[in-house]
From Swiss-Prot:
This is Large ribosomal subunit protein bL20. Belongs to the bacterial ribosomal protein bL20 family. Binds directly to 23S ribosomal RNA and is necessary for the in vitro assembly process of the 50S ribosomal subunit. It is not involved in the protein synthesizing functions of that subunit. It holds the Pfam family Ribosomal_L20. PROSITE patterns: RIBOSOMAL_L20. GO terms for biological process: ribosomal large subunit assembly; translation. GO terms for cellular component: ribonucleoprotein complex; ribosome.
Length: 117
């Protein structure tokens, strides 16, 4: 019996063209280029999700460092002091405290200062 595969191909083409909506030029209209663009964009999205984690950590460290220096302490001394004091606040929480609750962050810095000196 003869198998006709037009339906499957049409479905696959539609899937890629739907994902390529908004791409420029033939990247959104021609199947072959749309597939290439979509596959590349999915790879870039994967890489971007990894990079975002690095970038956020860098941002948190910059914010903590700036706030720590306002309180007369460097970032590295602050982190060392907190680890020796047994404080288990992560960088995300410390950065949030530094931005949104300066008095609480100052208290944390005092705890670290007591351990370092």
């Amino acid at each position: 019996m003869r198998v006709k595969r037009g339906v499957a191909a049409k479905r696959r083409h539609k899937k890629y063209l739907k994902m390529a909506k908004g791409f420029r030029g033939s990247g959104s209209t021609l199947y072959r280029t749309a597939r290439e663009r979509v596959e590349r964009s999915l790879c870039m999205a994967y890489v971007g999700r990894k990079l975002r984690k690095r970038d956020m950590r860098k941002l948190w460290i910059q914010r903590i460092n700036a706030a720590a220096r306002l309180n007369g302490m460097s970032y590295s001394r602050l982190i060392h002091g907190l680890s020796t004091a047994g404080v288990t606040l992560n960088r995300k929480v410390l950065a949030d405290l530094a931005v949104n609750d300066a008095p609480a962050f100052a208290k944390v810095v005092e705890i670290a200062k007591a351990q370092v000196s």
